[in-house]
Amino acid sequence: MALQDVCKWQSPDTQGPSPHLPRAGGWAVPRGCDPQTFLQIHGPRLAHGTTTLAFRFRHGVIAAADTRSSCGSYVACPASCKVIPVHQHLLGTTSGTSADCATWYRVLQRELRLRELREGQLPSVASAAKLLSAMMSQYRGLDLCVATALCGWDRSGPELFYVYSDGTRLQGDIFSVGSGSPYAYGVLDRGYRYDMSTQEAYALARCAVAHATHRDAYSGGSVDLFHVRESGWEHVSRSDACVLYVELQKLLEPEPEEDASHAHPEPATAHRAAEDRELSVGPGEVTPGDSRMPAGTETV
């Protein structure tokens, strides 16, 4: 019996289209083809988007993100959490494929816990970033999509690293990842200072994500705000992005302009003052200091 008879490659194809794909064109995978490879070549191109950001300042590291999970034009979840705790002093933002991000963060949590048990202390943020970069770089070219910002506090203070699935690892003060990152960078570059207060940092992060969700079609929902301190990470708030943007616009509205005559009064000159004095005094009257007043005359 031939192999093609065992595999039934010559039999009529009775496989129906997948219920999870559009029916136009009949998305049935041919016999003998790898489904993943076939769909990568012939499948629909689905757009993904998000807005995540993180920045470092003197009181710790701020991480913020929107909560909309989308697949093309379909909003899969309007209230997902895109900031994942790794351990007590380490957070990570997620951008890319949700399944890949969740899987690799579980792997990172496991590896860091094993190192903590072996060494008796938590690894540094730089060690965690290097470990994640090394593990994901082995799968380069296999359609892995993970872009994350690791925010933590270790023995050297607040630290921030960006790690991508191809093995890229960068250290910096400001990172924003996702389709809404150009809009978030515009707000961050204008208002960021390393010596800002905690409330100023909260307001800056909320403002950046809110503006990005307003301009980016694939970002939305709410704004999650996290703060990593020396004592550990803290979930500060979750605010509705639309309401937050409206409140920010009200704060930026210009004050009503005053009347032009009051806003720009005519400058007083010596000639103008003399004319006003002549108008206020009658033609036959004499004012103090006038040259027509006789010498030695006192005014009452």
UniProtKB/Swiss-Prot annotation:
Enzyme class: hydrolase
InterPro entries hit by this protein: Ntn_hydrolases_N, Pept_T1A_subB, Proteasome_bsu_CS, Proteasome_sua/b, Proteasome_suB-type
Pfam families the UniProt entry points to: Proteasome
Keywords assigned: Cytoplasm, Hydrolase, Nucleus, Protease, Proteasome, Threonine protease, Zymogen
Catalytic activity: Cleavage of peptide bonds with very broad specificity
Gene Ontology terms: biological process: CD8-positive, alpha-beta T cell differentiation; proteasome-mediated ubiquitin-dependent protein catabolic process; proteolysis; T cell differentiation in thymus
CDD domains found in the cross-reference section: proteasome_beta_type_5
Positions of region (Disordered): 1-23, 255-300
Propeptide: 1-49
EC numbers on record: 3.4.25.1
GO molecular function annotations of the record: endopeptidase activity; peptidase activity; threonine-type endopeptidase activity
Any single GO CC term annotated in Swiss-Prot or TrEMBL for this entry: nucleus
Subunit structure: The 26S proteasome consists of a 20S proteasome core and two 19S regulatory subunits. The 20S proteasome core is composed of 28 subunits that are arranged in four stacked rings, resulting in a barrel-shaped structure. The two end rings are each formed by seven alpha subunits, and the two central rings are each formed by seven beta subunits. The catalytic chamber with the active sites is on the inside of the barrel. Incorporated instead of PSMB5 and PSMB8.
Function: The proteasome is a multicatalytic proteinase complex which is characterized by its ability to cleave peptides with Arg, Phe, Tyr, Leu, and Glu adjacent to the leaving group at neutral or slightly basic pH. The proteasome has an ATP-dependent proteolytic activity. Incorporated instead of PSMB5 or PSMB8, this unit reduces the chymotrypsin-like activity of the proteasome. Plays a pivotal role in development of CD8-positive T cells.
Family: Belongs to the peptidase T1B family.
Protein name, UniProt field: Proteasome subunit beta type-11
Native source organism of the sequence: Homo sapiens (Human)
Gene from which this protein is expressed: PSMB11
